[in-house]
C-alpha cells in the first residue's frame, strides 16, 4: 500500500497531496447530503443550493481521482480518509454547514491559489486548471454560507450570531485537528 504524505517536499509530492485530498471530497458531499436530509424545515431554495453544492463536491472528488490516474497512480493502492466522518456526524446540521462553508472552504483560498502558482511555475496547466476550477466552486460555496447560515440560525431558533457560530466552528475544527495522529491511522487501507 502507498503511504500518503501529509505535506509534499518535491513538486510531484505536493501535486499528489493536492489531488489526493481532492479525491477524498466525497466525504464533503456525503456530509452535505446528510444536511439535506436533516433540514426539512428549510425552504426549497436552500435544498436547491445545497444539492448543487453536493454535485460540486462529487465533481471535485472525480476530478482528484481522474488527475491521480492521469499522473500514474492507482486508486486501489491509496487509502481512504475517514476521520472527517467521525467528528462531523456529531455536529448538528447548522454547525456542520457553517463549519464546511464559512470555516473549511472559506479559509482554503490562499493555499489553493498557491497551488495554482506552483502548478503554473512548473508548466502543469492541467493541474492549474483543475485547481482554478475548484477555487471558483469554493467561492460559490462560501457565498452560500453567507446567505444561508443567518437563515439557518433563525429557522432553528439559535441565538448565536454568525460570528459566534463561526468562531465556535473554528474552535471545533482546531480541536479535532489537534487530536489527529500524524500517521495513516485514520485511513481505511484497501
Stretch-by-stretch model annotation:
Residues 1-190:
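Non-heme di-metal
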Amino acid at each position: 500500500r502507498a503511504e500518503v504524505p501529509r505535506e509534499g517536499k518535491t513538486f510531484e509530492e505536493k501535486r499528489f497531496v493536492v489531488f489526493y485530498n481532492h479525491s477524498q471530497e466525497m466525504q464533503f458531499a456525503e456530509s452535505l447530503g446528510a444536511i439535506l436530509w436533516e433540514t426539512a424545515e428549510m425552504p426549497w431554495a436552500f435544498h436547491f443550493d445545497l444539492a448543487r453544492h453536493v454535485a460540486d463536491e462529487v465533481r471535485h472528488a472525480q476530478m482528484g481521482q481522474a488527475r491521480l490516474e492521469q499522473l500514474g497512480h492507482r486508486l486501489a493502492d491509496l487509502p481512504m480518509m475517514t476521520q472527517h466522518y467521525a467528528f462531523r456526524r456529531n455536529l448538528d446540521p447548522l454547525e456542520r454547514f457553517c463549519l464546511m462553508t464559512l470555516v473549511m472552504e472559506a479559509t482554503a483560498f490562499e493555499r489553493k491559489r498557491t497551488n495554482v502558482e506552483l502548478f503554473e511555475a512548473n508548466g502543469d496547466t492541467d493541474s492549474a486548471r483543475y485547481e482554478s476550477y475548484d477555487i471558483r466552486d469554493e467561492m460559490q460555496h462560501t457565498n452560500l454560507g453567507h446567505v444561508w447560515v443567518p437563515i439557518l440560525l433563525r429557522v432553528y431558533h439559535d441565538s448565536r450570531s454568525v460570528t459566534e457560530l463561526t468562531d465556535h466552528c473554528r474552535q471545533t475544527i482546531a480541536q479535532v485537528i489537534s487530536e489527529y495522529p500524524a500517521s495513516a491511522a485514520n485511513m481505511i487501507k484497501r
